[in-house]
Regions:
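Arg/Lys-rich, positively charged N-terminal/basic patches that mediate binding to nucleic acids
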Residues: 1-47
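Enriched for short, Lys/Arg-rich terminal
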Residues: 1-9, 26-28, 67-115
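Short, intrinsically disordered low-complexity segments
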Residues: 10, 45, 53-56, 82
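Solvent-exposed, non-transmembrane amphipathic alpha-helical segments
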Residues: 41, 45, 58-65, 93-98
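A short, surface-exposed loop/turn module that caps and links secondary-structure elements
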Residues: 47-76
Length: 115
């Protein structure tokens, strides 16, 4: 995932993934359904960093606060079963989308305390 120029205020300077997420994505079989929906979701985020649903601060799982020190958190539904969790980070070149986790619905509910 490459960083690019900022074209509009909704376009991030880049979209990148946490190391663990990047390893997971690179392990997926070319042409697999999961890889297709992840790439489609990343394409949407490249055009609009606010495409996901903003998660209220009081609902942030401690996991993300402790591991990443996040002060904003978004959920993007890749399909009816798969969630992409991301944050926005200010960088010299603008605002970057950083993908923190890709979760199936069950893991998402566990992470956010719904299950």
């Amino acid at each position: 995932m490459e960083c690019g120029d900022v074209v509009t205020s909704k376009r991030p300077s880049c979209v990148k993934a946490d190391r663990e997420v990047a390893i997971f994505i690179s392990s997926l079989k070319e042409g697999s359904y999961l890889l297709k929906i992840i790439n489609a979701g990343l394409d949407v985020l490249k055009g609009n960093m606010f495409a996901g649903e903003r998660i209220e601060r009081r609902k942030f799982p401690k996991y993300y606060v402790q591991k990443y020190g996040v002060n904003n958190l978004y959920k993007f539904n890749l399909d009816s079963r798969t969630r992409l969790i991301y944050t926005l980070v200010a960088e010299e070149t603008g605002i970057a989308v950083v993908v923190l986790e890709i979760l199936d619905h069950k893991k998402y509910e566990e992470r956010f305390g719904y299950g």
